[in-house]
Amino acid sequence: MLLSRAYDDVVVGSGINGLACAALLARSGRHVCVLERNDWFGGAIKTDEITEPGFRHDVFSAWHPLWVGGQAHAQLGADLARHGLDYLNTDLPTGTLYPDGESAFLLRTADENAAELDRHHADDGDAWRAMLGEFFPNADLAFGILGTELWSRQGAGLGVKAVRRLGRQGAAEFAGRLLISARDWLETAFGSERTHGLLAPWVLHTGLGPDAAASGYMAQVIAVAVQEGGMPIPRGGGQKLADALVALIRENGGTCETSVHVDRVFSGGVRTADGETVSATEVICNVTPTQLYGELLEGYEDKAKGFRYGRSEMQIHYALSEPPRWEADERLARTAIVHLTPGLDGVSRAVNEADRGLLPAEATVVVGQPLTMDESRAPEGKGLLWIQLQELPWRIKGDAAGEFDIGAGEWTEELRERYAERIQSRLTRHIPNLESSILARTALSPADLQAANINLHQGDPYGGSLALDQNFLWRPLGSQPGHRTPVPGVWHVGASTHPGPGLGGGSGALVAQQLLKPSLAERARGRLLR
């Protein structure tokens, strides 16, 4: 039997939330241990040469606006910079390319965006300014929902602040607007379908579809965040963020270990698969509810049986002999993320097809171009593309285009490559030199993603469905919302918990904040000593 080790905090899983939490705790003087089952730190953050030597791909997640704009980075950013984290940014964060070759872009200032939207509809620029005029005075409330432990005194205080500022009727109206769908917001606010198609794909990055409740709120939050913060990425790849966090934890006396499989969590510590017990006052689990309640905590197997996962995704990575030459607007070649879609209805249709178990006939294609900011990702003169498809089923019932025999309805290598060919043929219509410049292509199906990272359950990168009953106040479970678990001293963080998915570290920061908050006894003692 291995000897037991003891820490203040053990973090199970080194995703962005686990690492952010551990770094905040370690920097505050607590003795922290991070245990990761994979052979790399970072969870869905991984940079690797998976196509050709010299081409450094962000294998899963790639874009860091939520992190750079979040509270964890605000507290840790200077220290992480000392450990080699250097962010690059762009004035062309995103755009949408339509089948007819027309395009629309989201830029970095209100005036630029108003002018861009006016190209498509004479009143859309004014509508954009009006949206900003309504959003910014209450931005602390809008962003506060995503940066507050909702089941807490601070969460209640957010509601009190809204009532005091807006009045009861105004606060009720504000809360109601948070639940509007992206379709209803876009079609009410803007006259051009080009504007609708520019903003609608972004709700996919939150795990929602454009007809889902609260997708309008999330679309506005992302639109404002992109305008104000751009699309930052770390020089050298996303792995630089994970590496810097690990270095900071170790600098402050913490321990970080890979290839350690934790198979049991309990009040007071964890047990590893090789029989070691690691004791801790607090255990923070960066896992899904399926893992936490179905495997790690004994006696709670039924608790997460009703938890639902969302749509699956697929990644495609290209190493190219030359940069992609986009047709139409020259700005496309300089844009960090380009969405290929027919527009709002196209996104809605693809989401609906995936929800019904069909391979979408015309999926939204997310084309990431990290070389627009970071030339170190590929050899000089070469090209690199990061492709994400967010509207896919886990269990496949059919093909909406009627082209594929889906066999037993599972993701096979053959089906993965055939679907990648469908996407590639669409890309080639807009990038004529694509096929002639391909050095290598690596595709990862939902099954591949789940095999690579247990938290990508069923290929869902967003930690579970974000339907209203599994979102905000009810995330991850209506019976167990927030970050506490039924077991004292065991906490739950990650995309499956509030504030949900995205590379931001929000849930990790919220749990660290609670653990570092003085206890009632400490606060009382402090008042007596004044």
Feature roles, as predicted:
Residues 1-9, 27-28, 471-478, 520-530:
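Extreme N-terminal leader/targeting segments of oxidoreductases
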Residues 2-147, 463-465:
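N-terminal glycine-rich phosphate/pyrophosphate-binding loop and immediately adjacent elements
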Residues 99-213:
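Rossmann-like flavin
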Residues 121-124, 323-324, 356-360, 380-381, ...:
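Flavin-binding catalytic cores
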Residues 192-211, 360-368, 424, 429-498:
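A glycine-rich dinucleotide-binding beta-alpha-beta segment and adjacent secondary-structure elements
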Residues 221-268:
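Helical element adjacent to the flavin cofactor pocket in flavoenzyme catalytic cores
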Residues 263-379:
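Mid-domain catalytic core of redox enzymes
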Residues 495-516:
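A conserved FAD-binding loop/helix module that cradles the flavin
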